[in-house]
Amino acid sequence: MHDGPARQGKHQGIETPNILKINMERLVPDEPMPYDVPHELAEWSVQNTIHKAKHEDTDQMAVIHGSKYKDLRLECAEALEKIGYRLFLVANPEELLKRPRDLLEIIVSLRKAMNPNSALYFSFVELNFIPLLVYLGVDLFSQTGADFYAQLGVITTPHRNYDLKKYPLYDLTFEELKQYNRNSLDFVLREARAHIQNGTLRNLVEERCCSSPETMSALRILDRDYQEFLDSYTPLY
């Protein structure tokens, strides 16, 4: 089922979009690389990632490297798909969320080029970004962000995060806060699935994108520069 570019389906029995709890042992060996590096270093990372993935189990999760370079991200994804992988972690997620223009260029390009049966996974995400990422075609998300913010004493909500020292909304232990944040993530994804079913995800995206400069900027760029991508998923009656 589609609502715009967003997809609702199943991955290995899990209804998507959803949380994917993954053992890091299921991650195919790769060649990590920071985001803002020269093209030559990013290309080296891609080539080594592809080489390491050639003799691994294709049911595992492969990593799409390429740093800030769209051409390298596409090269990496194409090569990994040819090997047989269908589950992909998008590298450098924190950096992409800080750079809306890069985020859109890379994710839209990947979604357009990749096999529809391939699933994209974000290992770190802000909750207010999830409706937009789902709208772009990201399928699976990690609990890493929920647990990370709990360690910092920060409570996460669909609209924004609160440092409990500054905003003492609740008196929670670490375990209680971690569970609260995980529940918030679960709610946001359930909400996204319900909106896809009702054909109203775009409304949710517009509502949540008002909650931060990064999400607002990303939505403006999406509507201005990627209308053809959005229109390709708009049903004609």
Language model features with spans:
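C-terminal extensions of enzymes
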Residues: 2-6, 18-23, 30, 168-237
